[in-house]
Swiss-Prot record:
Oligomerizes as a right-handed, spiral filament on DNA at oriC. The keyword Endoplasmic reticulum does not apply. Belongs to the DnaA family. It holds the Pfam family DnaA_N. Residues 71-112 are annotated as: Domain II. PROSITE patterns: DNAA (PS01008). Residues 330-451 are annotated as: Domain IV, binds dsDNA. It comes from Staphylococcus haemolyticus (strain JCSC1435). One of its GO terms (cellular component) is plasma membrane. The gene is dnaA. This is Chromosomal replication initiator protein DnaA. Domain I is involved in oligomerization and binding regulators, domain II is flexibile and of varying length in different bacteria, domain III forms the AAA+ region, while domain IV binds dsDNA.
Amino acid sequence: MSEQEIWKKVLEVAESEISKSTFNTFLKDTELKEIRDNVAIIFVIHEFYAEWLNSNYKEVIQTIMKDVIGYEVEPKFFTAEQLAELDETSRKSNTPSEPQRQIIEYGHEGTDQFNTHNTFDTFVIGPGNRFPHAASLAVAEAPAQAYNPLFIYGGVGLGKTHLMHAIGHHVLSNQPNAKVLYTSSEKFTNDFIKSIRNNEPEAFREKYRNIDVLLIDDIQFIQNKEQTQEEFFHTFNELHQNKKQIVISSDRPPKEIAKLEDRLRSRFEWGLIVDITPPDYETRMAILQKKIEEENLEIPAEALNYIANQIQSNIRELEGALTRLLAYSKLQGRPITTELAAEALKDIIQVPKSKKITIQDIQKVVGHYYNVRIEDFSAKKRTKSIAYPRQIAMYLSRELTDFSLPKIGEEFGGRDHTTVIHAHEKIAKDIKADTIFKQEVEDLEKEIRNQ
């Protein structure tokens, strides 16, 4: 399929999945320019649109594109000016080189691999991130001397990647010749597969082991990848033994990553584990105020207060809401007020806004109720005190989430989907037979929904 055909199909699906006003405003006039190095380069007409789409709809478009073309690419939105800069950079760097040199050099790009905005100076500190910020700064000041590894976990859009970029900037500012590599577990996996396919194991190891600081994002995605875990285990060991700093991020703590080898889990726990929680009201207001100061804008405090009260989930959505309001005000030619903010954000604010339930949420509530540790839900233990709560958690996972049977099984230690079906049938039968137990399960369900 041509880029035009691919994008036509993507837009058809997107139009059915998002609100009409959002689609018409932000996506309707976009254009897929090309797919380059697993990155889909997409043209938009306005810088506000590029920023807003990159912040709010990147994952949606990524999922749709995978369904359309059969493999995963990362969508990135650019204006005409940004595309021109991108093409100029590409032309300057487009010199022939041997494949293995490409693998080695990719990633050792100094500060170019980091978002220029993501520094410690621009990080807004609040109760939910004060400790992770302090730990990250300590690591950046003295790599491999303070905490090694540093493991940062928390939900999407809370600032994990910002802190990792800030560490990279700070290290290179103090040590310009340091070799700092920022990557994701998915990129690590893809490079590993490529090295096997091209018979270039030494080039791969040179890239990932001949460095001073490794910053690896979203480590949870190496679960179920046995060979990748094996390779990362040896990479981790070599870096740690040579006193090189390792910083890891995840959406959950090591003990809750299903199908992660115990030897890797224990190494992740060698250093310091810190968690980032959603920002409180004061932090949300500070983030918005800092953003408008950076952009040299004036927005009424009442409008900022409205955004801070309505968007409570994460920083990415908070900044995305502000970007959307600015774009809406400019396009409508109207001054920003609380009323305009409510109008601009009506598609992304749901009242009441219900939190999407995860399997981890269910395991935490059930585990607390029955005194079962989170890791025991994934363990092979079959004692009734663990096995029965595990079945209850599986039952609730089917009832309260949209996850597939295999995905639920995966989150319970890689169990087969038939095990999930059996657990659901057994608990459903017990609920019918025992009114006290039925009330117990209903109470658990209420607690999960009200978290």
